[in-house]
Amino acid sequence: MPYGTRYPTLAFHTGGVGESDDGMPPQPFETFCYDSALLQAKIENFNIVPYTSVLPKELFGNILPVDQCTKFFKHGAVLEVIMAGRGATVTDGTQAIATGVGICWGKDKNGELIGGWAAEYVEFFPTWIDDEIAESHAKMWLKKSLQHELDLRSVSKHSEFQYFHNYINIRKKFGFCLTALGFLNFENAAPAVIQ
């Protein structure tokens, strides 16, 4: 029996950072720092599959903090994510990394919710930062990106933008920072019927 395309109906937001004095080339921050960031984000035992940024309307009001979802996690499962994540080496001049994910929801001409879009933000800083700087920069760039996504599609804003961010001041040789949405529950659209 055929089934249609799959779409998420429950998501969570999370974030994590990691740093290390050890790493393997060519991207030493990917080796130990990335795993540590996944651990802090509580998604270290998933197989991570990143994808782009379109959100079905069924996710509206169904994006929860990660701590509300961990009891449903399955070791070794595939976790589809929208992730802003990057690593850096302090010898390249990066002392801090900030990441963020923003969400916008659009409405049609009748005011009905169409669905949403996400945007990702990553920024490297030559000095240490604090949460106020990380949050303000994330909101500034994500707001611009989210508005672009709406304008590009000629869609009106349905509700307030949502923002999630994270940052790290790197104290070791290598660092990694991530902010992510993870998708847990799914349904299927009606299958296509071609006459």
Curated annotation (Swiss-Prot):
GO cellular component: cytoplasm
Domain of life of the native organism: Bacteria
Catalysed reactions, as listed in the record: L-arginine + H(+) = agmatine + CO2
Any one Pfam family match given in the protein's UniProt record, by short name: PvlArgDC
Enzyme class: lyase
A GO MF label: arginine decarboxylase activity
Annotated site residues (Cleavage (non-hydrolytic)) in this chain: 52-53
Enzyme Commission code: 4.1.1.19
Cofactor(s) needed by this chain: pyruvate
Gene Ontology BP terms: arginine catabolic process
Keyword DNA-binding: no
Coiled coil: none
SUBUNIT field: Trimer of an alpha-beta dimer.
Protein family according to the UniProt entry: Belongs to the pyruvoyl-dependent arginine decarboxylase family.
Name of the protein in its database record: Pyruvoyl-dependent arginine decarboxylase AaxB
Species of provenance: Chlamydia trachomatis serovar L2 (strain ATCC VR-902B / DSM 19102 / 434/Bu)
Gene coding for it: aaxB
